[in-house]
């Protein structure tokens, strides 16, 4: 296929057109009075959204060169969402502002490489200043405020996330699911839960809830299959003497071993239940070890020279209760020593820091949460499927932003933190490097300008007022149209969101500004299908039956 090549200003201007179109679609969603964007789908109802990254992902332009520019900034929006959970619109608006301002200077004769160097230095200084301006999230109220802003000013979602985080802790797992009703719900599972249910319905003790519930049980952990009853008999006899319930967690339990457990349960000889161990392979062994540490027991493992026959009461874990349904097992208040649990938590945290695999990291974080905080499930309700999807996206965004706030701290929101950070830096740069720094500094006004514009206010006046204010925490509340103390009004952003948005915006803008040639495919129009009307009645085929 033939290729089209553009050089210098012509190439950059084409790229800019694509960036501008993407920015124009995304920027309208910014701020408390941002507008909706309606997106056509190839099937089903159109999507209505105020989520910047959802809009950016849908922008696909006809002109291949414009599309190259748009796709680079689209990647920045997605990357910002992945790293910080929010700030996609901020990153897009900043990237556009930096590219636009830089293009003007480079067209006027500035050296792109020197300009890039100045931009990088300014970005570094502003990020350092943002970190100085940040402070820790102090309480549940501030968590709710961060979540509310990220959920497009939905206080109910903000409070729901704050409740979830309060109950499971900052390391706890919070998942978002679709509810089967129109109401939002928060369900918290205290203790460790894993996705394995009872091996036989005969183990059920609560027929109303269809669950097997064991109070103060012993917990036997074995890393192989149990099929032979002879191996299991010694420990069962010891358990019977204590009169306590028993939970067996093993790779699998089958044959006569499972049949005997069921018969003993039905006859009332033993209150017993059995489940498969969670995970697979090495991960299963690690999770069994986690359960052992949580419950104060030991994993009976043939690799360590132990057999099931040799197991004694001292090897068993304990918990205040265990609840098992057909899909999940929940161990509440394991009897493990706090020091051992904390050591295991620190070990998993170290593994998370070292791993380069996203999948492994996710699984390690799940294990960490099971040990340290428990699990909270936010169920999002809505009247229609379209509303449900849009709301679930907002809850996901708000949850990620809240975790970012807890991780790195908060700064004043509404685009004001970037302007305050800009006023505090002093870079002694010369020539085109100074121009590069000035480009970034001017672009930092863009988010606040856009928020004010979307709310229907004079953007120039708003930016000047905030910039010239002597009060460090003063910003513009676009929802009310007032200049307020942003911290006191609860208008705050995670510093990680601001930092990542700026770094990614400068990165893509400087890459676009230093582009000197572009190569793209020439889209050829496919010839139309020939007109069939002149082919007559195909009368010669009349003899076919």
UniProtKB/Swiss-Prot annotation:
GO cellular component: cytoplasm
Enzyme class: isomerase
Lineage: Bacteria, Pseudomonadati, Campylobacterota, Epsilonproteobacteria, Campylobacterales
GO molecular function: ATP binding; ATP-dependent protein folding chaperone; isomerase activity; unfolded protein binding
InterPro entries cross-referenced by the UniProt entry: Chaperonin_Cpn60_CS, Cpn60/GroEL, Cpn60/GroEL/TCP-1, GroEL-like_apical_dom_sf, GROEL-like_equatorial_sf, TCP-1-like_intermed_sf
CDD domains: GroEL
Record-stated family: Belongs to the chaperonin (HSP60) family.
Transmembrane segments annotated in the record for this chain: none
Protein name: Chaperonin GroEL
Catalytic activity field: ATP + H2O + a folded polypeptide = ADP + phosphate + an unfolded polypeptide
One GO BP annotation of this record: protein refolding
PANTHER family registered for this protein in UniProt: 60 KDA HEAT SHOCK PROTEIN, MITOCHONDRIAL
Biological source species: Campylobacter lari (strain RM2100 / D67 / ATCC BAA-1060)
Self-association and partners: Forms a cylinder of 14 subunits composed of two heptameric rings stacked back-to-back. Interacts with the co-chaperonin GroES.
Job description of the protein: Together with its co-chaperonin GroES, plays an essential role in assisting protein folding. The GroEL-GroES system forms a nano-cage that allows encapsulation of the non-native substrate proteins and provides a physical environment optimized to promote and accelerate protein folding.
Claim: Phosphoprotein is one of the keywords in the record: no
Pfam family, one: Cpn60_TCP1
